[in-house]
């Protein structure tokens, strides 16, 4: 336990059983953190740890005011390519962050910065995929050692409006094409529903099977086919759906489920996480993107307003909806002894970004050559 000033204390938890026991407190903190996303819920993070965590790697920094949890940095220790403290959740989580109670954001951020500075004597603190306005920006602001922020992943966002309102935002010709596609869904008899809590696990497993069928014979994200990913989704989404932090929609054609979509929700954010559909929809000339977004927009519109996030990736098909581009950041923080690790990581990231630009430029030249 370390003193943090102004009545706050910071405790480092490395015990998996203690992490599991934090569920109730954690969800209270999550609800009081304005910037929290679904990827910071206890259900998501603890389930992720059960599937992906490494022995003795857990590093939970817990900020308390008396007995009340007012801040948390869910991190883990990794050794490669350099010693780092990174957020739990890994690459399958679209946003990484800490949690700070809205009534203690300033002092909580300062307390976490102090605790992480001690840890940074031997490890680089590395936050990828930081959404603008995230709580970890408070930690970064109070950091007294070497630090750097880099542009990271791209997300596309739409306002949380019903489909009819989203269509009104589009250019006239494109809006009419979308209306025609929506009308075709009706003529074909495509229906959709949000599944009940007791059906969630079965529906999630059906989603994965349809996702495999959808990508059969094509290049699929390997992790989406691995048992640990399937078990993580089934384990985490059930309690999240029960608490309103997730929703699963099924699409039916002639009484058969032909597609499933998973939405993750928190506050004013609804994120489109993963979907799967049967290839027969292609044979029926169903516009799958329109089908999915029609249901997603209705799910998002029933929330607290805010945004419908298409999450990471700027695939061309997403731009038909005229989304807003949001750039996530990477926040790197070090101490005097780990400053060389920060410099090496920044150089590596810069080199990768430059190489990608060069490759894109060559691809563009070939396309127009």
PLM feature segments, named:
Residues 2-8, 12, 137-169, 277, ...:
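Active-site/acyl-donor-binding loops of N-acyltransferases
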Residues 5, 88-92, 184-187:
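Short, flexible turn/loop "capping" segments at secondary-structure junctions
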Residues 10-85, 130-153, 161, 168-282:
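A conserved beta-strand-loop-helix scaffold within acyl/acetyltransferase catalytic domains
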Residues 56-58, 120-122, 246, 303-305:
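Short, high-confidence coil segments that cap the C-terminus of an alpha-helix
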Residues 64, 107-115, 223-343:
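Aromatic (often tryptophan-rich) hydrophobic motifs at membrane interfaces
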Residues 90-121:
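A gly/proline- and charged-residue-enriched helix-loop-helix capping module
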Residues 117-134:
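ATP-hydrolysis module of ASCE/P-loop NTPase motor domains
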Residues 125-127, 193-194, 307-309:
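Short catalytic-loop micro-motif centered on adjacent basic/acidic residues
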């Amino acid at each position: 336990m370390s003193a943090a000033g102004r009545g706050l204390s910071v405790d480092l938890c490395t015990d998996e059983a203690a992490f599991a026991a934090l569920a109730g407190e954690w969800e209270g903190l999550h609800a009081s953190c304005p910037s929290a996303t679904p990827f910071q819920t206890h259900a998501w993070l603890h389930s992720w740890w059960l599937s992906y965590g490494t022995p003795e790697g857990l590093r939970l920094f817990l900020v308390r005011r008396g007995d009340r949890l007012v801040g948390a940095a869910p991190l883990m220790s990794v050794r490669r390519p350099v010693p780092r403290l990174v957020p739990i959740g890994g690459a399958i989580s679209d946003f990484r962050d800490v949690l700070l109670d809205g009534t203690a954001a300033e002092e909580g951020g300062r307390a976490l910065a102090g605790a992480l500075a001690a840890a940074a004597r031997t490890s680089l603190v590395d936050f990828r995929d930081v959404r603008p306005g995230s709580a970890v920006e408070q930690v970064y602001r109070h950091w007294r050692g070497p630090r750097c922020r880099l542009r990271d992943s791209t997300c596309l966002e739409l306002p949380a409006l019903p489909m009819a309102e989203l269509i009104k935002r589009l250019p006239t010709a494109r809006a009419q094409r979308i209306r025609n596609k929506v009308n075709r869904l009706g003529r074909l008899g495509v229906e959709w529903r949000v599944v009940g809590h007791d059906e969630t696990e079965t529906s999630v497993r059906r989603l994965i099977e349809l996702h495999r069928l959808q990508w059969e014979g094509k290049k699929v994200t390997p992790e989406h086919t691995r048992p640990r990913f399937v078990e993580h989704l089934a384990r985490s989404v059930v309690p999240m759906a029960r608490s309103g932090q997730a929703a699963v929609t099924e699409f039916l054609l002639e009484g058969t489920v032909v597609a499933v979509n998973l939405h993750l929700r928190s506050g004013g954010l609804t994120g489109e996480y993963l979907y799967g559909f049967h290839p027969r929809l292609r044979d029926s000339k169903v516009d799958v993107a329109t089908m999915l977004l029609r249901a997603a927009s209705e799910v998002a519109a029933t929330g607290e307003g805010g945004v419908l996030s298409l999450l990471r990736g700027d695939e061309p098909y997403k731009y038909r909806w005229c989304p807003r581009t949001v750039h996530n950041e990477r926040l790197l923080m070090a101490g005097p002894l780990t400053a060389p690790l920060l410099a090496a990581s920044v150089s590596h990231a810069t080199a990768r970004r430059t190489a990608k630009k060069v490759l894109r430029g060559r691809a563009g030249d070939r396309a127009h050559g």
